[in-house]
């Protein structure tokens, strides 16, 4: 798979293009007197060093771009790499099956769990089918149906958050978008099973929170979590979306800042160059964190679990 490089990654892209060119020449003519292998290796080492340098000093806006990267792994990618025996469940039993939310029963190291997550698309048709990862009310009602099923069968709930926000269309509002989100917030706060939430890309406003109330809340290193997009904030405060980089810095949308504010528990490191550069390695790190979180929560009684979750919610806003 050829990589898509963002604007701030162009120096890396130029090096990678040189590497690809030399590699192609070497394959076409193995009788060349010049030892291209050594040059290719030198350029690869230089590319790694340059990538480390660039990614060591990323701003909030650059992280936001990475969180939206078109090749970034989505919920179904992590399900494929981390879980076994996934059986997808569909529909809210009231209106429709919202493809922007996927969910179902699977096994994590042999243990039954309920998985729920936002799902974006990659190709144009798939993006439209998934509504660009923006759920309607029926999506959140489907999620709640699966959570209640998990509680009934004593299965831990694992959610993956990756959405620009809940769908703001007229139809969604008419069908009770705000009510669906509010109901999820209320019900998730009292479910009597462990809930682990992980922001894997964009964590946009109430659309993210609707599956984001948990006993453990994690973020991938280059994911974001905010009440509004940087562009939306800039449009309100400065009347121009061009101020999005400034808004991103001011909003504190990145994982280290949110951990500092005690809004999340863990920042999960990503492979060099972000998650899409090495999906299996990213999935392995995420799996290890999920297992560690489950081990911690398994030691709590139902009452302790609920009390801890309640205190967590009440402490939001206090540093």
From Swiss-Prot:
GO terms for molecular function: acetyl-CoA carboxylase activity; ATP binding; carboxyl- or carbamoyltransferase activity. It is found in: Cytoplasm. Acetyl-CoA carboxylase is a heterohexamer composed of biotin carboxyl carrier protein (AccB), biotin carboxylase (AccC) and two subunits each of ACCase subunit alpha (AccA) and ACCase subunit beta (AccD). InterPro entries: Acetyl_CoA_COase_a_su (IPR001095), ClpP/crotonase-like_dom_sf (IPR029045), COA_CT_C (IPR011763). This is Acetyl-coenzyme A carboxylase carboxyl transferase subunit alpha. Pathway: Lipid metabolism; malonyl-CoA biosynthesis; malonyl-CoA from acetyl-CoA: step 1/1. Belongs to the AccA family. One of its GO terms (biological process) is fatty acid biosynthetic process. The gene is accA. The keyword Nucleotide-binding applies.
